[in-house]
Amino acid sequence: MNEFQLKYGCNPNQKPSRIFMADGSELPVEILNGRPGYINFLDAFNGYQLVKELKEATGLPAATSFKHVSPAGAAVGLPLTDVLKKIYWVDESIGELSPLACAYARARGADRMSSFGDFISLSDVCDVATAKLIQHEVSDGIIAPGYEDEALEILKSKKKGNYNIIKIDHSYKPEPIERKQVYGVTFEQGRNEFVINEELLGNVVTENKEISQQAKIDLIIALITLKYTQSNSVCYAKGGQAIGIGAGQQSRIHCTRLAGSKADNWFLRQNPKVLNLPFKENIGRADRDNAIDLYIGEDYMDVLADGEWERVFTEKPEVFTKEEKRAWLDKNTDVALGSDAFFPFGDNIERAYKSGVKYIAQPGGSIRDDNVIETCNKRNIAMCFTGMRLFHH
């Protein structure tokens, strides 16, 4: 098929709506189940580019969790620790996790509040282990280059048989020129085919020039994630995954703060106080995620007040104090950070440092680069200038 009719566009009043190939050729996708919508396809095509590039850059299977045309999480298939399995709600009954399943668990688990109702993109054929993980999550749909037979049947059972499943031709290569219309005016530009790899990290401008191999992988993950995140954007990454993404902010410091708060939450969820919260057996994942988000945040009394805690816990948990949280966050180290444009002030570095950042990749080019470098030197952070902006709109 060279076009697919959609129910509507971004909003129900925006009709007619379709996706199509302007040159009359066949669409590079098959709809295996459901009826994906306009925003679903935006998430699918942006997300698939991200995971395809992650796989090419690292050689590892990759997954991303998209919401409203920005990733909530992105990761490659490195093994999970027992703690990560617990905070990502990985059920032991699934058995051994494939690398692709690990990538999906990481991508979905980094920011579970934002990933609720996500659209999933996978770099590889969806296997049974990955499908079993997805089966238990609230999700709008998935795109992948293929599906094992049993995995496809598992996914088809979601949403009362209406789960959106898209298969994309992995050999598809888009035209080098892309176009879109705004207010009746056509915009045209070359596709962003800039390749992000280790060579991009060679210009280390700080006194500390030591960037570990794992940190290089994490910086690559952060930068590729930013390439498909609405600007301005900042991404914190650690251990093969994004752990905090700040998207669509109009000031750089707000990107850094937003992404940093998400990275902090990811690490706070690993504290024994949170791991051992006494949830009632009948409390579902979404309610647990909401309760944890409140418990580790400033509004903890919203879940600990008398009359509230009884709804989700078997007994009232102790307060996770500000001092305890700060002491725990101080243990988080070796975090990598990418920025889609230069840092204009050193305050971004100071905020990043509070969330355990030790490695930074950013374009450079600010008139205050000296101040930013000086702040990195003060905090013993290794920073490289890539010379390449990664805006995405």
Please give the residue ranges for each predicted region:
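Active-site loops and adjacent core secondary-structure elements that bind or stabilize anionic groups
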Residues: 1-200, 215-233
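Gly-rich Lys/Arg/Thr-decorated short loops/hinges at beta-loop-alpha junctions or inter-strand turns
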Residues: 23-35, 110-116, 190-209, 287-308, ...
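Conserved helix-loop functional segments at active or binding sites
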Residues: 53, 228, 265-269, 354, ...
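Flexible, glycine/charged-enriched surface loops at secondary-structure junctions
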Residues: 57-65, 165-168, 231-238, 268-279, ...
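Glycine-rich phosphate/pyrophosphate-binding loops
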Residues: 61-62, 67-72, 78, 233, ...
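Active-site-proximal loop/turn and secondary-structure-junction residues that shape catalytic pockets
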Residues: 70, 126, 238-241, 249, ...
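Glycine- and Gly-Pro-enriched alpha-helical subdomains that act as flexible
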Residues: 72-112, 243-342
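C-terminal binding/interaction regions
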Residues: 118, 122-123, 136-166, 171-173, ...
